[in-house]
């Protein structure tokens, strides 16, 4: 599974599972899982609300990472195959 591979990679890199990259990775997995669920169950409004909350959390973490370390941010979005944040 991708999660186990990423966890082992993160453990080699640093012992902290609370890193921004790891949190974004977990949120991305949850988002993908909820998206596939909502394709089948379109009227599941509680899941839609949960998806919006997780999207907001991931967006805030990515904004923080892009401000603090642009190189790590670019590597992460390429690794997870997600789009770059829109800037205002």
From Swiss-Prot:
Origin superkingdom: Eukaryota
Disulfide bonds: none
Keywords: Chloroplast, Plastid, Ribonucleoprotein, Ribosomal protein
Primary location class: plastid
GO cellular component: chloroplast; ribonucleoprotein complex; ribosome
InterPro entries: Ribosomal_uS15, Ribosomal_uS15_bac-type, uS15_NS1_RNA-bd_sf
Subcellular location: Plastid, Chloroplast
One Pfam short name: Ribosomal_S15
GO biological process, alphabetically ordered: translation
Gene3D superfamilies hit by this protein: S15/NS1, RNA-binding
SUPFAM superfamilies to which the protein is assigned, alphabetical: S15/NS1 RNA-binding domain
Any GO MF annotation of the entry: structural constituent of ribosome
Assembly mode: Part of the 30S ribosomal subunit.
Similarity annotation: Belongs to the universal ribosomal protein uS15 family.
The protein, known as: Small ribosomal subunit protein uS15c
Naturally occurring in which organism (per UniProt): Lepidium virginicum (Virginia pepperweed)
Gene (UniProt): rps15
């Amino acid at each position: 599974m991708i999660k186990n591979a990423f966890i082992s990679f993160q453990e080699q890199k640093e012992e902290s599972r609370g890193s921004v990259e790891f949190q974004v990775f977990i949120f991305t997995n949850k988002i993908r899982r909820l998206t596939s669920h909502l394709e089948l169950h379109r009227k599941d409004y509680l899941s839609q609300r949960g998806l919006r909350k997780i999207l907001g959390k991931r967006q805030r973490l990515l904004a923080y990472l892009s401000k603090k370390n642009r190189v790590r941010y670019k590597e992460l979005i390429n690794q997870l195959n997600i789009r770059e944040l829109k800037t205002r």
